[in-house]
């Protein structure tokens, strides 16, 4: 239950001539940034009880498959995750498991692949995602440790370890897909911008109706918001959004026939 809050008071700022031009310049810059963001939103019925107790893992896997359909390959992906259970106030980045997601994406696009094989690959990918999630929530994710190593070197005035100068590391941290997921009873639209010029931001709101007869993990639907930069010709929010919707439909059909992953 939410506590009643007092009515907010309007704050009035006195802007002098010394900072007035800077404020106007910042407003124009912000408007130009907002004008460069392409947004595509849609609602989906979700996966129902077939999603299991952790639908977030299923959605993460589905988004990997959708990116593969849209661009023909997987990409570096991150989902900011709270570490409040072990490090209050801290976050880490959750990455999806690449190999099982790639195998699933290829099987779903193979007209000769049997549904039983597709379902087995889906289970493998979701289990791998759940395993990574538990690892990160326990404070054992690699991203925070690597960041700690970088900051320790900077604080000590030492050269950065070679791993941070390797082109592979730069590619692995070029997050073309940044994901945000939140559960709520009323349903909400989550918009976040891309992290890189040729990337996407994807927010997924899990609508969880407060019905005591619903099984654990039952989802009342999904609200998906996809963002991209209009200045990039390699990305289009509606294009990825259509791929996401198609993958949700494909996985929903598998789950209705074969049960939760």
Model feature map: region roles:
Residues 1-261:
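Acyl-CoA-dependent O-acyltransferases
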């Amino acid at each position: 239950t939410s506590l009643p809050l007092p009515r907010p008071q309007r704050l009035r700022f006195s802007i002098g001539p010394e900072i007035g031009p800077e404020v106007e310049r910042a407003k124009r810059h912000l408007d130009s940034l907002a004008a460069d963001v392409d947004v595509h939103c849609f609602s989906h019925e979700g996966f129902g009880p077939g999603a299991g107790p952790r639908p977030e893992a299923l959605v993460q896997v589905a988004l990997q498959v959708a990116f593969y359909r849209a661009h023909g390959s997987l990409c570096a992906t991150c989902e900011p995750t709270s570490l409040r259970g072990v490090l209050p106030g801290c976050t880490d980045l959750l990455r999806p498991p690449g190999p099982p997601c790639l195998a699933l994406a290829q099987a779903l696009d193979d007209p000769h692949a049997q549904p039983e094989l597709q379902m087995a690959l889906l289970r493998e990918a979701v289990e791998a995602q759940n395993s990574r999630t538990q690892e990160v929530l326990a404070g054992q994710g690699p991203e925070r440790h690597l960041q700690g190593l970088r900051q320790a070197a900077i604080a000590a005035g030492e050269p950065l370890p070679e791993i941070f100068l390797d082109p592979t590391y730069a590619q692995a941290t070029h997050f073309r897909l940044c994901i945000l997921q939140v559960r709520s009873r009323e349903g909400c639209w989550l918009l976040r911008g891309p992290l890189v010029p040729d990337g996407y931001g994807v927010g997924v709101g899990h609508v969880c109706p407060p019905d005591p007869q619903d099984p654990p993990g039952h989802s009342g639907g999904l609200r998906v918001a996809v963002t991209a930069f209009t200045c990039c010709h390699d990305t289009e929010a509606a294009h990825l959004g259509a791929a996401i919707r198609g993958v949700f439909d494909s996985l929903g059909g598998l789950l209705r026939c074969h049960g939760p992953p």
